[in-house]
Amino acid sequence: MALQFTLNQDAPASAAVDCIVVGVFADKTLSPAAQALDSASQGRLTALVARGDVASKTGSTTLLHDLPGVTAPRVLVVGLGEAGKFGVAPYLKAVGDATRALKTGAVSTALLTLTELSVKARDAAWNIRQAVTVSDHAAYRYTATLGKKKVDETGLTTLAIAGNDARALAVGVATAEGVEFARELGNLPPNYCTPAYLAETAAAFAGKFPGAEAEILDEAQMEALGMGSLLSVARGSANRPRLIVLKWNGGGDARPYVLVGKGITFDTGGVNLKTQGGIEEMKYDMCGGANVIGTFVATVKAELPINLVVVVPAVENAIDGNAYRPSDVITSMSGKTIEVGNTDAEGRLILCDALTYAERFNPEALVDVATLTGACMVALGHQTAGLMSKHDDLANELLAAGEHVFDRAWRLPLWDEYQGLLDSTFADVYNIGGRWGGAITAGCFLSRFTENQRWAHLDIAGVASDEGKRGMATGRPVGLLTQWLLDRAA
């Protein structure tokens, strides 16, 4: 965890912390805690706001020192924007802005009072949970492979949250731990996070908790199961594949929810080799796997009363003399044959066998998560994941969960009219669908291996990582998936 969290019900003016975080709206209205500090300081805060020394527009932060009558030596005032437009997005932005302002520097402990604000259609428990997940995300530092590079170790370490809902805090912390677990895996270089490492890390976590268990299938076991599609992708790599299976037994005899995550630890594209301007970010192609593992972490930490199974096919798509080729015909675990049109459409080839394997758990619902297509990113950008399902109830559950925690998805069609684009003369199905509608035809491909399941597909290509040299794994959609499971457990 980037931060430690506690609950605090002290009067803001007497809180024994390095800094108190309060808010001010564009019309100069103070948040409840800011009003309390203003009263304790005999109007000092109001005077500073009126004089223009405190900015109130969204995204602004102003650090004040030594307000009279206030125990904390610092007060951070966060701009909340227009009161009439204050809702979920401005609240989350304000929490993140406050945390980033204190991420480095002299402040080690702070009291966040923004949880006292009224957020439209949300309750106090939501305010606390989201404050924890957003602030921990904002305070995250990657250090795993920095070597001798000096890390700034100053700044915020402990954040007290105004409120008294211990369960909300615990669920927020569990979710934040899941997000950070996923981000750490996603950010690791591919020479560190190999299929074996991913499997060992997931199994090590499961081994620490009663009710959690892990099974790791090796190449021989997958071959015995007939996973010819997955193993074809793995042929060109010296890093041999694993199938990671994690189980959380919190729901008695109830049918499990099953999450399947694409775990391509590095994607060269294979024989259809990727080029510079994209290939250097292909360590993030395992973020689907990392994020369902992160959701497992959140579920276990929150001790949700459900049964959950997570399946991650962990494979490296590399190239050597034994690598699979365009025009190969391979046989999947389902028995369906697949003509390879492009070796860079490998994610669906490992997922189809993992989805077939997942049927043995008799899922209540089956959801796969994958950085599957650039086409989804072209269509939807970096703001939302793509969602496909033939089951309206399941799709609506996932969409609602994403809206609730602002980790959103947008539904794309999965109509039968697209299926013809996957026709093959030489096999049961072609692994690509042509130039147009690539995200949808990828979903259509997977639908052929989930025909008897209540299934949905999340294409997270646009949301799993930030772009560019300084980009990092985001941990999305751990928030969406955890909220969906919380809703199922309610």
Swiss-Prot record:
Query: Which coenzymes or cofactors are required?
Result: Mn(2+)
Q: How is the cofactor bound?
A: Binds 2 manganese ions per subunit.
Q: What class of enzyme is it?
A: hydrolase
Question: A GO molecular function for this record?
Answer: manganese ion binding
Q: What does the record give as the active site?
A: 274, 348
**GO CC terms for this protein?**
cytoplasm
Gene Ontology process terms (BP) = proteolysis
- The superkingdom listed in its UniProt entry is Bacteria
Q: Where does Mn(2+) 2 bind?
A: 262, 267, 285, 346
First-listed, main subcellular location of the protein, grouped into a coarse class? cytoplasm
Q: Which UniProt keywords apply?
A: Aminopeptidase, Cytoplasm, Hydrolase, Manganese, Metal-binding, Protease
**Positions that bind Mn(2+) 1:** 267, 344, 346
For whether the record's keyword set contains Zinc, the answer is no
Q: What is its EC number?
A: 3.4.11.1, 3.4.11.10
Free-text function comment from the UniProt entry: Presumably involved in the processing and regular turnover of intracellular proteins. Catalyzes the removal of unsubstituted N-terminal amino acids from various peptides.
Sorted alphabetically, which NCBIfam families does this protein's record hold? PRK00913.1-4
Protein family:
Belongs to the peptidase M17 family.
Name of the molecule in the record: Probable cytosol aminopeptidase
List the gene name: pepA
